[in-house]
Amino acid sequence: MKKNIYKYLAGNDYPGRGIVLGKSPDGQKAFVAYWIMGRSANSRNRVFEPIDGGIRTVAADPAKLEDPHLIIYNAVLTLRETTVVTNGDQTDTIARFMNGNLFPGYSFEAALATRTYEAVSYTHLTLPT
């Protein structure tokens, strides 16, 4: 499915966190586009920083950091010929399972099965009337 990501994002007041994966027309190269945006001051206080083997989020101004729990994480980690991209600290869990070959053929699923999840929040859901 082809989408013009520029038009989509330009028309969206709050795109939140996003991950786009794609490949070159010849299928030989892959790309990842990742963006972050926040509603709260704490969530907006982060930027990407390159690290060995990936990209992580860090506080733009450490003095303004309130709660790092949901905003500071490895966003991208590369393991041999595999790249793990997520929008939270589950990147580390998946990378650990895949790197250790803990469940051959099922590492991704097995890693996520170890996680707990927040309850669904409908505070931003607008239902039709």
List the predicted regions and their residue ranges.
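Conserved small/polar residues in nucleotide/adenosyl-binding loops
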Residues: 123-129
